[in-house]
Amino acid sequence: MLRAALADSVSDHLIADVPVGVFLSAGLDSTTIAALAAETGTARLRTLTLGFEEFRGGPNDETALAGEVAALYATAHETRWIRGDEFAAARAALLDAMDQPSVDGVNTFFVARAARQAGLKVALSGLGGDELFASYPSFRQVPLLARRLGPLRPLAPLGGVLRALAAPLVAAVTSPKYAGLLEYGTSVPGAYLLRRSLFMPWELAGILPPEMARDGLAELDTLTRLGATLGDVADPRLQVSLLESAWYMRNQLLRDADWAGMAHSLEIRTPLVDIELLRRVAPLLAAGAAAPDKRAMADAPRRKLPGAVLARPKTGFVVPVRDWIAAPGGERGLRGWARQVHAAFGGVA
């Protein structure tokens, strides 16, 4: 059932009267899509990999393994390389295309640009596989945190006091948001917010005008809405899948794919985010411990994926934004990038 559902979704998303390709990394999602697409008999399927000069030859360089996958399935493959100075040159255009602030989409912006330069007008993406097949670290970390701290829930109202006292010490060794462990970590919605947020609610008044932060948080009522997303679902995997799909994938990943693709007049299609696919695999996803994981997805192609792909630990699509935007004395990584994006939209970095 799973193999047929995946194959049908990929086949349906290949239908077009313009050139179509596949974004190919060394991850299970895109390699599975490329393999299934090759099975359809599409004449000389085109695949594209984005490489970063900073990673060339290192553990985060996916180009060689992606090339191995392309050779196995006989695709017309291209690798496009990008450097930090190209990011700097395109930064203004990237932020302009963004429409509204986001910390993601950098990788999609550049791979979409490369695809358009290669003559593609449609590209298939592996977006959605992590949410569907439970492969984010959050699927393990969120239930574990809520389970371990759950007995302390009666003390959660005191979490704000503890957080204020512990914040300077926590900030010295890790992200400041983890000062809120007791305040947020005793429930699944709170643990998810703690795991996924870049900045926690109490930090926003230092980024936005305090009144705006206060009113926005009151209107959003984040924990209540996160809890409402779960409804009466009790299975930990399904709980996290709902949260990741509704809050991270829908609000960030899909929106970022849309603006990043449209910036280059490229349509990005997502075979793993498909209502018919979800209908067909929903009974499998509700099977508890027997629910299919990424390995089951990767077993779908008739011609099996290379062993190096199957054995490769999950790394995500790594972009060297941390190095590209690093500023002396400032926050690094996505928190630093978020402040720069906010400043570009009229805020204060």
Language-model-detected regions and their locations in the chain:
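A conserved beta-strand->alpha-helix junction
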Residues: 45-46, 62-97, 105, 118, ...
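ATP-dependent adenylation/pyrophosphate-handling site
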Residues: 19-67, 71
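Adenosyl-5′-phosphate
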Residues: 113, 120-122, 173-349
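Active-site adenylate/phosphate-handling loop in enzymes that bind or generate adenylated species
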Residues: 110-172, 176, 257-277
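Short beta-strand segments
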Residues: 22-25, 46-51, 79-81, 124-128, ...
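Short catalytic/ligand-binding loop motif for oxyanion handling, primarily in non-cytosolic enzymes
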Residues: 30-33, 88, 131-135, 140, ...
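Phosphate/ATP-binding catalytic cores across multiple sugar-kinase/actin-like superfamilies
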Residues: 1-21, 114-118, 248, 252-256
